[in-house]
Amino acid sequence: MRDVSNETASVSVVGPDAAAALSRLALGLRVGASALSTAGEGGWYGVGAATLDDDGRVERLFVSRTEDVWPDAWTVYGPVDAVRSLWMALIAEGARPAGLGVWGTLRVEAGRPVFGTDMDENTLPPEAGIVDRAVDQTKGCYTGQEVIVRIRDRGHVNRHLRVLELGDVPAPAKGAELLAADGSGKVVGQLTSVVQSPRAKGVLAMGYVRRGVTEALLGDRTVRVPADD
């Protein structure tokens, strides 16, 4: 085993034509676009690349599907030179480079929380809505299992992570508080991520809101809160 971090790069391809573009390129994909499109989250495929190194050896790339953004995306991992060649081929295919800001917008549009921004060590998985993809209900004992099982079988959490459409307004700061709609001043929620969303045609935010709250105040505006699951 050796650390290959400095020798490895990755590129993510996002969009409705992403799978088809990857399949068209000279990567020797073992699966076609339709198989990529139906792959489960985190599913890996080995890809034999057309790129050769100085020794004439075929480089190997790996592609994994992610549902962390909208639309779905695929991330390709491999040697730096091979990934650089893939990047150039994607540009030639008409792909447009985008940075972390765009990725963040697509993530919020997908309603996917990220650790360190929307979650921390004090967040319960049911609060963040990640139980289905982050908790194994059949696994043996693990730290926090009793709490998870108790919530699942006999209770509920008092807050939920929600995606909130704020409209065509100046973007509020991360951490901005949501207050009760009755004007009492009671804090009923807090924003964790805020982005400008072309899809929503305005500001889109993620934040935790107390269970049962359907409307809240953000400054002098009323924000509609999606219903509890």
Which stretches of residues belong to each language-model region?
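Short, charged, solvent-exposed linker or helix-capping segments at domain edges/interfaces
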Residues: 22-26, 87-88, 119, 175, ...
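Glycine-rich, small/acidic residue-mixed loop/short-helix segments
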Residues: 123-124, 128-229
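Anionic-ligand-binding alpha/beta catalytic cores of soluble enzymes and soluble regulatory domains
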Residues: 75-165
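Acidic, low-complexity central loop/insert segments
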Residues: 1-113
